[in-house]
């Protein structure tokens, strides 16, 4: 009876070990989604440096050339956000509250859905799906007319992944206070700002993938240390269990090498360059604070959700280790 109970306990420990590996695999999966997600740099301009239409056109004149020669972002948008606005369908006498984005440049760098407006289409707009429902009772709203502020607009399409949003082109005299840049490196963002004499603080959600990968490195390290410690003991009965653990460790290492890549921002000229690590840590802390404080689009909120899933899955194996100490002792 005692031997049977002992075997059941060992089987339970193996099951929990496998469960920890499964959680870890999901953590790697969510990390891979986060790594592949397009990261957008948001630049909030200083209060006295709003961008006019002339500023935007000046950038666009040399955009294609600079993109190829200086590895500048593939897309950019100059925009501003106006909250607490009202959109109205006069024919049905329906209104709803919306946040208005007035955008010069690429819309797709800001919204997750496919959306295209001509640069001079001041009478066109896009509506979020729920906004279209409130105004028209349907998401088939293209071609319908609405009023927002002093402007009469024609709906060009519906944004499926956004909420309470209306996107339009700003009028000629309007200034914008934000810049969005498509996926690129931090160094390229700084080069972009310097090249065009723009001022503002860059912010991005790309650092979330860096945090996620560091969390994923912890469990294999702890597991390897435990395996090395277990080699000092001789438990013939546990030979199969040890083999299983080594297989799991090898699988984790394979997943790590296949999916994790150390970003260039974390590679110093010399590993003993302590000033580099000090500056990197300071910059990393600033990114976290900026991300918490920044106005997030649906894309950033979705990436934050994926990060949380990866972080939870990375932490679950440690919870299982603690549980095993209680069950398997």
Q: Which residues fall in each region the model found?
A:
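Membrane-proximal extracellular/periplasmic loop immediately following the first transmembrane helix
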Residues: 28-87, 276-279
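Juxtamembrane interface at the cytosolic side of transmembrane helices
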Residues: 214-264, 320-329
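A cross-kingdom feature of multi-pass membrane systems that activates on extracytoplasmic/periplasmic
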Residues: 181-228, 261-309
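Hydrophobic secretory-pathway targeting helix
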Residues: 1-39, 329
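Hydrophobic alpha-helical transmembrane segments of polytopic membrane proteins
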Residues: 310-319
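Solvent-exposed, non-transmembrane alpha-helical starts
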Residues: 51-55, 121-123, 162-167
């Amino acid at each position: 009876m005692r031997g049977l109970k002992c075997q059941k306990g060992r089987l339970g420990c193996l099951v929990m070990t496998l469960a920890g590996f499964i959680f870890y695999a999901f953590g790697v999966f969510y990390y891979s989604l986060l790594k592949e997600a397009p990261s957008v740099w948001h630049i909030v301009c200083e209060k006295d440096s709003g961008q006019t239409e002339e500023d935007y056109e000046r950038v666009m004149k040399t955009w294609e050339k600079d993109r190829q020669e200086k590895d500048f972002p593939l897309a950019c948008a100059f925009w501003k956000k106006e909250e607490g606005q009202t959109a109205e369908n006069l024919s049905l006498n329906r209104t709803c509250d919306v946040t208005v984005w007035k955008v010069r440049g690429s819309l797709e760098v800001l919204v997750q859905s496919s959306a295209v407006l001509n640069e001079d289409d001041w009478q066109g707009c896009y509506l979020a799906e729920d906004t279209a429902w409130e105004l028209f009772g349907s998401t088939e709203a293209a071609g319908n007319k609405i009023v927002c502020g002093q402007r009469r607009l024609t709906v060009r399409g519906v944004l499926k992944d956004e909420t309470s949003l209306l996107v339009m082109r700003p009028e000629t005299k309007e200034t914008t206070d934000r810049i969005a840049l498509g996926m690129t490196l931090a160094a390229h963002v700084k080069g972009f700002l310097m090249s065009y004499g723009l001022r503002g603080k860059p912010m991005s959600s790309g650092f979330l993938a860096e945090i996620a990968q560091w969390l994923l490195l912890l469990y294999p390290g702890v597991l390897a240390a435990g395996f090395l410690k277990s080699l000092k003991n001789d438990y013939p009965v546990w030979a199969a269990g040890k083999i299983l653990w080594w297989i799991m460790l090898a699988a984790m290492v394979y997943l790590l090498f296949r999916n994790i890549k150390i970003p260039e921002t974390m590679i110093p000229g010399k590993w003993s360059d302590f000033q580099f690590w000090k500056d990197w840590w300071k910059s990393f802390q600033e990114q976290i604070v900026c991300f918490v404080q920044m106005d997030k689009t649906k894309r950033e909120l979705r990436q934050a959700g994926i990060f949380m899933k990866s972080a939870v899955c990375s932490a679950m194996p440690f919870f299982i280790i603690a549980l095993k100490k209680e069950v398997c002792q």
